[in-house]
């Protein structure tokens, strides 16, 4: 979607006080790809800093014929926010959880670079920093995931570059 221009819809209020932001990419007459961001009311503590993201394929059955899975390529570069690079780097990694497990797995905290291929289902994948995380949570799990990070050089104002290729 990097090379395409989406059309923004007006910001709308939801019944629970959240706001929705919708971006559409026309594909054919009456068919479009829709990105829907739901920004929750921060007066509810359990939803502070929570942004929901849904992808909708509207009237796209002819364009998506025979598709049973979608490949997601997710990447993010994190900036150094704290004074001490080494300390912040130790708390920055990729985390994930297997279905039915209570423990959380991760790629390691202070490695220069690391990657892992997971061929079984995972509930979610998160790019984790010391105080904040970005998580991809699929409604019916992620079936495969290739996860990796590279650590930036101290003094570059960056911390890590994350990537995750997942099948949903």
Positions of PLM-derived features:
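Soluble non-transmembrane domains of integral membrane proteins
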Residues: 1-168
